[in-house]
UniProtKB/Swiss-Prot annotation:
This is Unknown protein 22. It comes from the Eukaryota.
Length: 14
């Protein structure tokens, strides 16, 4: 899903 993608992206960003 799109939410999952954004969630993972945030984890990688930090």
């Amino acid at each position: 899903g799109y939410i999952a993608y954004v969630h993972q992206n945030e984890l990688v960003k930090r």
